[in-house]
């Protein structure tokens, strides 16, 4: 018996939509599909339900609909190829064109076959890399909230039980001269002042990547935040210790560790676009760092959206590493997961220095205010946005450094002409 509700309700679990996508586009696409299958191919409806339930774990049959005159299907005034539409609805929300899809060998009615029926089974296609295609800006449909704070006494008990040691208490952020008129060209490779050479008490014989991260990193500062206008860093880098910090556009001079007011940062070379953008930052963003597991959440407090590029977040959701996520007012999203980083580090450490070193890209997060960048914007890079920040996460960077220091050098030859 066909479970119509099961096929429809799967959209309720779809977390993402593309930035220019109508809120009900996926639902309309599924309603359209239901009508076509009921009219032309009821058996295919059962095949679709089975395919969605198995999620590619078992072999499934083709799910076909009639090919239109131009091969495309119209949903909400937008035309696209049907297999692209339903692969996007059910599997890859960041999918943009048929150039990113390739049919599996068992698919008898794939789009490329040119037959009168087209298979739209999303598990009969696999994703391929398409050169020259910028990933779309994606918008979460639902918020991810940070976990509730554990009472201090319970947290202490749990930590002693887990690692035999206690995490240090938060301390106030070090004094920073916010108004220092110092400008630096953007350096994509990182932090200037962070020391990752500390010695850690790790039991002999235990691979560093398998040690709980609280044993590897016990410093009071969990991140360093840099503020940029276009490709120029403005002011000093700010080390962060408070587990909850607000970065806003106001001018609060209080340095209490829980707020960074970008309105205090001065730049004599600021243009009108930057000035106007700064006026709209407002309440900005609230960052919540969960010390117990190393995860980081961002909640947009501004009336204008914030735009986030986190390769860790993108990996979790199966997106291209350079994908930009748009977070609207009052929406919250996990932008870093330490457990995922640990799993990747464990895997990469077995594959050598180069694979492990590449994970340093996951230790920093870029975030712009008000103005976005990417496929749907005239700005193709974060350094073209008026106001943005870069967040360097200390714990994963120190953990990675510890692993790299136990490895030999890269096998790639290097010379003056390499």
Curated annotation (Swiss-Prot):
Domain of life where this protein originates: Eukaryota
Start and end residues of each MH2 domain: 222-418
MH1 domain span: 8-134
Knockout-associated phenotype: RNAi-mediated knockdown enhances tail tip morphogenesis resulting in retention of the pointed larval tail tip in adult males (also known as the Lep phenotype) of sma-3 e491 mutants.
GO cellular component assignments: cytoplasm; heteromeric SMAD protein complex
PROSITE patterns on file: MH1, MH2
Pfam families: MH1 (PF03165), MH2 (PF03166)
Subcellular location: Cytoplasm; Nucleus
Protein name: Dwarfin sma-2
Highest classification ranks of the organism: Eukaryota, Metazoa, Ecdysozoa, Nematoda, Chromadorea
Gene name as annotated: sma-2
